[in-house]
A protein has these predicted regions:
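Fe(II)/2-oxoglutarate
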Residues: 1-2, 175-177
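Aromatic-acidic/polar surface patches that form glycan- and anion
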Residues: 45-48, 94, 149
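Catalytic core of non-heme Fe(II) oxygenases with the double-stranded beta-helix
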Residues: 71-144, 151-155, 159, 165-173
Length: 177
């Protein structure tokens, strides 16, 4: 299911910025924390967006898309631990997204992230701190509850939407132009 992967750790400063942002914005301690619905007011994204932009550009180059497409990407943060809920199975595809990704900023030894197939079988890819993986946005995936006490599982995730694709005189434009 994974179409691209690398390992890139966050700088100590950027990771500290993420922790501070999570600690000051995580209100319901029983629910996993996400900035998916409200990331505009968090200053940490001023530094996360360029960090992930470099990784995504490398990925798009390796996948052969950097030179034949224009794209947008999104970024959000999430945190869960043994006291919070997990992230139930879901997919990111709404008709626009092509590639989804997750960066495991801090993860336990337990593999929590999984893909789920049509028979409800779970497949757990390798997931170590610093790993960045990408997959087709239509793939159903989820996160099991963290079992390790006093451990915050922290990730950044996002989607890539192709705004324009040009190859062999085929030009596709999305409604996002």
């Amino acid at each position: 299911m994974i179409i691209w992967r690398t390992n890139q750790s966050l700088s100590d400063g950027l990771y500290s910025e993420m922790l501070e942002s999570i600690e000051s914005n995580h209100e319901n301690k029983k629910e996993f924390f996400t900035t998916f619905y409200d990331k505009n007011n968090l200053d940490v994204f001023n530094n996360l967006v360029p960090f992930y932009g470099k990784i995504i550009s490398k990925m798009m180059t390796d996948l052969g898309l950097e030179h034949i497409s224009r794209y947008q990407y999104t970024v959000w943060m999430q945190m869960s631990n043994s006291s919070t809920t997990s992230h139930k199975p879901h997919a990111h595809f709404t008709g626009l997204e092509s590639i989804s990704w997750v960066h495991f900023a801090n993860v336990p030894d337990q593999k929590c992230f999984y893909f789920k197939d049509s028979n409800s079988n779970k497949t757990y890819p390798d997931q170590n701190t610093g790993d960045f993986i990408a997959w087709p946005s239509w793939a159903i995936h989820g996160v099991d509850e963290v079992k390790q006490n006093n451990f915050d599982r922290i990730i950044c995730a996002g989607n890539i939407v192709l705004q324009e694709y040009n190859f062999n005189n085929l030009k596709l434009l999305s409604d996002l132009n």
